[in-house]
């Protein structure tokens, strides 16, 4: 939501005076995109996979209305805003001498699942392709066969030393493979 993105921004400001340069939507679900209105208001670019953008265009207003039903006070100021930058397979940029590879490794948890791979640190910000300390949720648009195939052929071969899962604490590959 707008207020959650604003609170996150305050946390960022508490540890650095550097500006936010880019916001990456990990997929098209509400928890990933309902804060876009805050970042867009600040003029910050928002990146998402093209399938996540389609998901927001197709279902964003319904997702926002559902959020308002259970969390009305935290929905104030929230609007459905799609990412202004899209990618299909990979988006690469360097910031502060660090190379970031924004990846869509394949279908998994939901439309447009996105990962951030930082090769020099062997760090994967996995998004919702990886869970830790909880059961994987299966939704109507989840392709479990695709998820397993994407994991085996694209995610696991990267062999990240560190993984920040979509849900759960930072961990490693053997731990997320349990879930």
Predicted features along the sequence, with ranges:
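Metallo-beta-lactamase
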Residues: 1-2, 92, 99-179
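Active-site HxH/HxHxD metal-binding segment of metal-dependent hydrolases
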Residues: 3-6, 10-85, 89-92, 111
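Short, basic, glycine/proline-bearing loop/turn elements
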Residues: 19-21, 97, 136
């Amino acid at each position: 939501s707008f207020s959650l993105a604003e609170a996150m921004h305050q946390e960022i400001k508490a540890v650095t005076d550097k500006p936010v340069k880019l916001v990456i939507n990990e997929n098209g679900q509400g928890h990933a995109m309902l804060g876009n209105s805050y970042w867009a208001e600040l003029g910050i670019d928002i990146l998402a996979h093209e399938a996540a953008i389609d998901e927001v265009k197709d279902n964003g207003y319904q997702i926002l209305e559902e959020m308002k039903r259970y969390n009305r006070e935290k929905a104030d100021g929230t609007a459905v805003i799609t990412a202004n930058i899209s990618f299909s397979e990979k988006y690469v940029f360097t910031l502060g001498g660090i190379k970031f590879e924004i990846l869509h490794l394949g279908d998994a948890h939901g439309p447009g699942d996105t990962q951030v791979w930082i090769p020099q640190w062997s760090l994967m910000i996995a998004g919702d392709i990886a869970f830790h300390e909880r059961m994987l949720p299966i939704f109507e648009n989840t392709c479990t066969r695709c998820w397993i195939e994407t994991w085996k052929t694209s995610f696991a071969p990267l062999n990240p030393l560190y993984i920040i899962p979509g849900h759960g604490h930072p961990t490693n590959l053997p731990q997320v493979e349990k879930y």
